[in-house]
Amino acid sequence: MLQISLWKRLVILGLCLAALITAAPNMFYARVEGHNDAVSAFEKTGAMTETQEAAKAAWPDWAPSALVNLGLDLRGGAHLLAEVHLGEVYKARMDALWPEVRKVLAAERATIGAIRRVPSPEGELRIQIGERAQIARAVEVARTLASPVVSLTGVGQTDYEVTGEGDTVVFRLSEAEKKATDDRTMQQSLEIVRRRVDAAGTREPTIMREGTDRILIEVPGIGSAQELKDLIGTTAKLTFHPVLSTTSNPNAPVASGNELLPDAERQGLYHLLDEVPVVTGDDLTDARPTTDDNGAPAVSFRFNVSGARAFGDYTAGHIGEPFAIVLDGKVISAPTIQAHIAGGSGIITGRFSIEEATDLALLLRAGALPAGMTFLEERTIGPELGADSVKAGMVASVIGFVAVVAYMIASYGLFGFFSSVALFINIAFIFAVMGAIGGTMTLPGIAGIVLTIGTSVDANVLIYERMREEIRSGKSPVRAIELGFDKAMSAIIDANVTSFLSSAILFVLGAGPVRGFAVTTMIGIAASIFTAIWVVRLMIVIWYGWRRPKTIVI
């Protein structure tokens, strides 16, 4: 018998109703987006402007408000491809290692003689010893600083390779440690870029690693690529160093272990600093814009426990000495230590504007990029172009939908109309699922929807053609409908599973636009199996139970 149990009917109707309700906010995109932005602003600040209150009132709070996010090509925005300078991290590792090496080798001075650091290529640390004949002993002692690499691919290897070349001990990062360092650096860079972009209030950015040392950044809705570069391109590397001396000579001699940096405010003034910082921005727990004693914009900061201890110990032992605050290779402040600073907090003053102080605090809170970046590609897509893309995509979708509906009704009559209703519900499922999972719609994604519109009725074509064959062979209408669904099922499942797997491979191996196409196609395929089989079958069962026709025309 042509029957569907009550609970199955309720489940099918419930899923269809849920999809239509969840997808509905996308029909009022601007209104719902304004409502969501106002709610988000209220959650952050606890207050709303009159404009935000009006925007919030434009959409009911009880109604669904999940939207499909528009990608860069539909909303407009900025695209950047950045290269991370991994070599800087290698150098920083060697610089941080030097004090430990100096300590262990100094303990062997009676045997190996005097030690001194000599210039080294990037990623190496070279220490010259006084007693050339004792190089083997120096290498043996230095190797005690090497530790096992913490990674699956580096099992059995140490982080440093220590060798002797003449009278010089040479430290190098092992290949396993380089790979592990690269992965950590890229992961940290991705996270910090994501924090900075999120802190600026942008919507649904795409931030992902490409290759060994590159990061793809796409932010819809931002004004320009330059604005995005200003937001994420600053390293915001904050360090605190002892000041050894000041000079106006940019070519003043610099001993090994020291560095000469320019003053950010006073042109022509340079500070000779100890290269090893007392504390770094990694020890910061908070940074906020504030004002100094004169009411000028400044930035307050606070260290974590270890940073506060190191900062307090240093200030206690160096009262009356200058102390440099270095940001991105420039000395932004070099105050004299007036007293022991035990609280682990302080203030950065300078000739900041309010906006500069706010931006600096944001960057410091987000954390310092572990290495500098070079932008290899930059592209700005204007909102007008994005709007044109949305319009073109909508036109293509409507034309495709109307053409498919016209063909199905012309070919299969009332049953074609049932398929058209199911097709509309299928599209609603795509938008409902995309909105629920926070997916981003791109121009290729719209192409995936158009493709789904054309292919989702394939299952019904197979079913209807099978029904026609059964009717021609003399079967009753009820039996023809049952056999049409039953005998076409295996072909429908096989075709859709292979298509789904192909789209899944595109999603896994592809990137950017290809993944957008794959996502909408996979959702469309999954929805089409449900709508073409169960939704259409339910409509036919309800119609047949109501009309009880002696014959059916398909």
Swiss-Prot record:
Any one GO cellular component localisation term in the record: plasma membrane
Keywords: Cell inner membrane, Cell membrane, Membrane, Protein transport, Translocation, Transmembrane, Transmembrane helix, Transport
Intrachain disulfide bonds: none
Native species: Rhodobacter capsulatus (strain ATCC BAA-309 / NBRC 16581 / SB1003)
Family in the record: Belongs to the SecD/SecF family. SecD subfamily.
Membrane topology: Multi-pass membrane protein
Name of the protein in question: Protein translocase subunit SecD
Membrane-crossing residue ranges in chain numbering: 10-30, 392-412, 414-434, 435-455, 491-511, 516-536
Gene: secD
SUPFAM superfamilies cross-referenced by the UniProt entry: Multidrug efflux transporter AcrB transmembrane domain
Highest taxon above the source species: Bacteria
GO biological process: one example: protein transport by the Sec complex
Subunit structure of this chain's protein: Forms a complex with SecF. Part of the essential Sec protein translocation apparatus which comprises SecA, SecYEG and auxiliary proteins SecDF-YajC and YidC.
An example molecular function term from Gene Ontology annotations: protein-transporting ATPase activity
Purpose of the protein: Part of the Sec protein translocase complex. Interacts with the SecYEG preprotein conducting channel. SecDF uses the proton motive force (PMF) to complete protein translocation after the ATP-dependent function of SecA.
Localization of this protein: Cell inner membrane
A Pfam family assignment: SecD_SecF_C
